[in-house]
């Protein structure tokens, strides 16, 4: 198994995927990136069992194969390279040799078959939304989500999809944010609670991204697909509180203030 790839191109993709990897994995194999090579397509995956993300990279190769490479060690190694083509060669002695213009490096690898497979969604519903709109929705709500382990449903963002609009809600019982978009909609009504970690990953990737994101979801999992990248995560199980009950319906008091002045005064 052999392939050639740009050092900066690979590093950029791996740094994004590295955000999935936990510092306290229960399975040692999860400390690795999964490399799945199929000729000129290299699919790289990272997982913590709750969240799995994969990206497809274009490489120069005619081979096929699957290996698991130590994530932190590979990232640290790639950071030392200037932009240049790198040649990866998988040897029979359980090492992968990385050849650069400045020398060769050898990393031990594990059997890719040990890496857990991403969850396949059964009978999912699907909604499409522009990446920058989704990133804005996450930015405007995620900060209000709680951190209380005793109330897990409030530790994420509540997604409400309907044919009329998409609504995103977060609360920690002290503050509440509701963000609604009537310019995008779903084919049918759906509700689910997204955990913080995958939302933080999506927020960073999708900021300013005008690619369309396909959101697929069922009762237990959600999948976000865009631009050769796929993120699958487990949803938070439970019923979200009736947030509408705490939003005043008839409040005669209204204050209009310049945003910049208000921000300066409360800093």
Which residues make up each language-model segment?
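Structural preference for solvent-exposed beta-strand-turn elements
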Residues: 1-267
């Amino acid at each position: 198994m052999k392939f050639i790839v740009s050092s900066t191109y690979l590093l950029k993709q791996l740094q994004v995927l590295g955000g999935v990897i936990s510092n306290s994995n229960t399975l040692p194999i999860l400390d690795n990136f999964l490399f799945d090579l199929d000729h000129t397509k290299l699919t790289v995956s990272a997982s913590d069992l709750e969240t799995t993300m994969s990206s497809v990279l274009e490489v120069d190769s005619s081979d096929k194969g699957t290996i698991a490479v130590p994530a932190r060690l590979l990232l640290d190694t790639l950071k030392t390279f200037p932009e240049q083509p790198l040649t990866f060669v998988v040897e029979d002695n359980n090492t992968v040799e990385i050849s650069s213009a400045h020398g060769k490096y050898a990393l031990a690898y594990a059997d890719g078959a040990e890496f857990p497979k991403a969850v396949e969604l059964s009978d999912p519903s699907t909604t499409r939304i522009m990446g920058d709109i989704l990133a804005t929705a996450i930015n405007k709500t995620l900060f209000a989500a709680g951190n209380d382990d005793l109330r897990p449903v409030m530790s994420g963002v509540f997604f409400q999809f309907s044919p009329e609009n998409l609504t995103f809600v977060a609360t920690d019982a002290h503050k509440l944010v509701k963000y609604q978009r009537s310019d995008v909609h779903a084919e049918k009504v759906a509700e689910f609670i997204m955990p913080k970690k995958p939302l933080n990953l999506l927020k960073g990737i999708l900021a300013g991204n005008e690619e369309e994101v396909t959101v697929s979801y069922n009762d237990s999992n959600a999948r976000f697909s865009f631009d050769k990248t796929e993120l699958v995560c487990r949803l938070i199980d439970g019923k979200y509180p009736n947030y509408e009950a705490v939003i005043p319906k008839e409040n005669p008091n209204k204050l209009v203030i310049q945003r910049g002045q208000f921000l300066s005064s409360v800093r």
